[in-house]
C-alpha cells in the first residue's frame, strides 16, 4: 500500500512491549534483490533467514524471545480492536497536544516539516535541570527522556505512542508545570 520494500522495527516503541525483539518484513521485490547482494553476512541475511523459516515450518534460525512473541500476539489483537487508523489518530492528537504545550512553555526542537507522531523533542529554553525534574516525575509515576549526546540537557523528550492516552499527556505536562512553577 505504501510502497515500502523493507520494514524493520522493534517491540518496545509504538507496539508498547518490552524490548528484546526486532520485527522485519520484506516485499517480494526486496526478497528477489537479496539474491544479488554479495557478502550478506549472517545476522542481516534476510534471504537466508526467510528461506530457513519457510523450509522449517516457521522455525526461526535463532531462538526467539517467545514471551515477547505471545505478548505481541495479544498486543496486535488490541491494536486491531482499536483500529490502526484510530491508533494513529490518537497518537497524532497526543502529539499535537504536546507540541502546543511545548510551544507555550518551551519550544519544539524539530523542524515543523519533520515532526514525529510518536515522540516530541522539546528545546530546554528555560535551562531547567532535566535530571532533577525527572527525579520528581519518577516519584509521581511518570518519566521523560533527556536529550542524547550534545543535546543532553539542551532537549528533553515526551513520548506519545503505544498505550499512552491523552490523560497521560495532560498528566505529565501539568506535572511539569507544577514542579517547575511555570506560569
Where are these predicted regions, by residue range?
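Short amphipathic alpha-helices in soluble, non-transmembrane regions
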Residues: 132-139, 172-177
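Short beta-strand-to-loop capping motifs
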Residues: 26, 122-126, 160
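Conserved PLP cofactor-binding pocket of PLP-dependent enzymes
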Residues: 140-157
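PLP-dependent enzyme catalytic core of the Aspartate aminotransferase-like
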Residues: 154-183
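Active-site C-terminal subdomain of aminotransferase-like
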Residues: 15-99
Amino acid at each position: 500500500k505504501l510502497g515500502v520494500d523493507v520494514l524493520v522495527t522493534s517491540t518496545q516503541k509504538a507496539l508498547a512491549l518490552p524490548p528484546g525483539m526486532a520485527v522485519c518484513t520484506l516485499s517480494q521485490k526486496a526478497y528477489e534483490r537479496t539474491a544479488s547482494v554479495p557478502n550478506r553476512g549472517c545476522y542481516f541475511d534476510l534471504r537466508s533467514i526467510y528461506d530457513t523459516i519457510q523450509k522449517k515450518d516457521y522455525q526461526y534460525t535463532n531462538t526467539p524471545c517467545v514471551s515477547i512473541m505471545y505478548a505481541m500476539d495479544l498486543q496486535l489483537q488490541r491494536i486491531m480492536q482499536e483500529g490502526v487508523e484510530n491508533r494513529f489518530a490518537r497518537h497524532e492528537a497526543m502529539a499535537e497536544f504536546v507540541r502546543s504545550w511545548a510551544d507555550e512553555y518551551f519550544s519544539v526542537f524539530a523542524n515543523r516539516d519533520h515532526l514525529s507522531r510518536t515522540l516530541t523533542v522539546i528545546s530546554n529554553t528555560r535551562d531547567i535541570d532535566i535530571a532533577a525534574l525527572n527525579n520528581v516525575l519518577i516519584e509521581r509515576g511518570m518519566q521523560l527522556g533527556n536529550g542524547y549526546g550534545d543535546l543532553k540537557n539542551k532537549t528533553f523528550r515526551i513520548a506519545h505512542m503505544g498505550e499512552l492516552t491523552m490523560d497521560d499527556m495532560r498528566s505529565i505536562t501539568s506535572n511539569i508545570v507544577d514542579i517547575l512553577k511555570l506560569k
